Amino acid sequence: MPAKTIYSVCGMCPVRCPIEVDVENDECRFIQGNRQVPSIRGALCTRGGAGIPFVRDDERPQFPMLRKGARGEGRWQRLSWEEALAQAAEKLTAVRSNYGGRSVLWSDTGGPFSDLRQAFVRGLGSPNYFSAESVQGVNRQHAALSLFGFSDDQLVLDLKNAREVVLQARNLFESVHIQQANDLLDSLANGGRLTVVDTRATVTSSKADRFFLIRPGTDYALNMAVIHVLLERKLYDAAYAEKWIADLDELGRMTAGFSPEVAEAETGIPAADIEALTQALAKAAPKVVWHPGWKTSRYTDSFFVCRTAFIINALLGAVGARGGLPLAARPEDVGQKGLNRFGDLLPSVTEQRADGVGWKYPAFEGGPGLLHSALSAIPANDPYPIKALVTYQQDPLAELPDPQKLTAILAGLDFLACITSAWSETAWQADLVLPLSPYLERESLIAQLDGVKPAFLLRRRCASPRFDTRADWEIVGGLARRLGMESLAFTSPEDIWKFQLNGTGVRLQDFDAKGIVELTGQPNYGPLAEGFRFPTDSGKIEMVSFRWRRQGLASLGSLAPRDRPTAGTFRLTLGGCGLHDEGHTLNNPLLHKQMPENVLWLNQDAAAALGIKDGETVGVSVQDRSGRIRVRLSEFIHPEAAFTVPGFGRTLPPESRAQGRGLAANRLMPGGLDIRDPSGGGLALQEHVITVRKL
């Protein structure tokens, strides 16, 4: 078969970059970023380039498997797909019959290809759908909701046109988002300036004009000091604030105690540098982006950190502005029709959510949900029994804290099923493993991308599956057919795409040219239109959220100085890297070769005081939890911080490369399922202090 190029979408991390794949004889030969998409320009990160080695790897689930021993024992029976889907349908039917559809939890990647899976959960009669953002981004989402009345996915980071950018605990040039990285590089090339705030130096900080090596856990003090200066010096956009911001006087009272000098004592950042940054932001306004954070389940005040980042943008008139945070346009905003949704084919579910969102926590939204809250409620059957969990490309035992406790919780389920393309700690405990085809071997739904130029994006199958694996729509469609959801029982991707596109005026062949169909020729930057109202109680950006006040939650907090770790102890901090995305890439042949294990970053002076040398293996412990890991010493990490990349320390026998390599950071988080941000609802994964000792 002659070579051909297929436009598709990467699936190696949650960013999902548009790609083009050269295929010959039904085999993927070369993969690169989609050269026809602005800001991609053929670029692809290392993870994306490892998609072909993943397809060729034999150490992944190859066929449906039924557990034939104790959970975690590793004894499996191979099933046909007919047997596997029948088994899953039987187990789900039993749980629904005995406890109701609400007793099923579904943990999902979320994102633009998830509509059919969400509809399936609705068809089960369950309100308990959770996306990956419930672990990583819920504090950021709720911060936006409290201010604007909508989630942060309705805002665009216009990095390309920004003149001042602040990246706070966002290592954009290593934990790569190709489009945003290229846009930021374009901005810097055109005279834009970058400030990086982090507890250690990174590739991103090496590109910065200013680098603030901040004391871990003190970002809130920095942000409040910037707001204090903006208000006290009257550097904010007064006309914008008068029109679009509510409770500005109250914000002034809340920030009165956060002078740059107070922030310096807490953060270690000189007051003069805080003043200079604020002046520079005001000068560049409204073409300013203060990044609200990527993985924001860090501290018990991370909601406040995200919220103050958004507030700084708003005070500078950047919300709704080109070069700032313009509102994401939907197809309807440019005179087009959006995709049809599968959820509209089924009645809504009125049951209360197991995580308390919407009733116990009325301010929070059910989009991502609070998976940790739902799982923690299982032992007490509160608010009702939870008896089944289905995961789609998610690994709670590797992503959530305290997997020791969580394993015991999952043991109380009647049914645990995992739809996954790679082995995971959770799949190893499952009753049923349904192998998902790697993204190069499956097609997906059409995705709707809201933004300054709304578009539809299509993932096509590039090659036939090597093993007995299936696409997500095939698995969900097969289950739907067996459970009486005929409206979701699709038998071909073309039928799915036809349903989605009906009435939009877009045809399937329109994707042939470049894999993406833009719905407008000109970017839609705004500004905020006359008469526009934010969907908040006041119709404005609320410095004090009425919605949060009704739940008894604080919109902002007072200064709470952090304790300093004692000698030999460090605050455990986490972050991404350019090679791995949590745990599912660790056994990838290409990526493992380049980064086989994680290391623990320590400040070289702090380590010297303990007699620890670079490259040595040290012991780490928290309460009764302990492990070993190699250290990397640097002068460019805060002395109170210990940093590592999460996801390592795999225990799975099928993964010959990753098994036993590195340290699982989440195992050093005893009680972590119950340590949460009270105003945001998210986890606080960096509220753990570890002891490091020389061996």
Predicted regions mapped to residue ranges:
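Glycine-rich phosphate/diphosphate-binding loops that line cofactor/substrate pockets in enzymes
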Residues: 84-104, 155-164, 254, 275-289, ...
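N-terminal export/assembly segments and adjacent metallocofactor-ligating motifs
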Residues: 1-233, 262, 270, 392, ...
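Acidic/polar loop patches that form or flank catalytic/metal-binding clefts of enzymes
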Residues: 29, 237-238, 274-275, 288-290, ...
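Extended redox/cofactor-interaction regions of prokaryotic respiratory oxidoreductases
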Residues: 116-197, 204, 220-224, 310-428, ...
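Long, contiguous, secondary-structure-rich segments that constitute the structural scaffold
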Residues: 462-520, 588-601, 605-695
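Glycine/threonine-rich phosphate-binding loop and adjacent beta-strand/alpha-helix elements that clamp
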Residues: 156, 440-465, 475-476, 480, ...
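A glycine-rich phosphate-binding loop feature that marks nucleotide/adenosyl-phosphate handling sites
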Residues: 109-110, 243-245, 325-336, 492-504, ...
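Flexible glycine/proline-enriched surface loops and loop-helix/loop-strand junctions
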Residues: 70, 168, 207-208, 257-262, ...
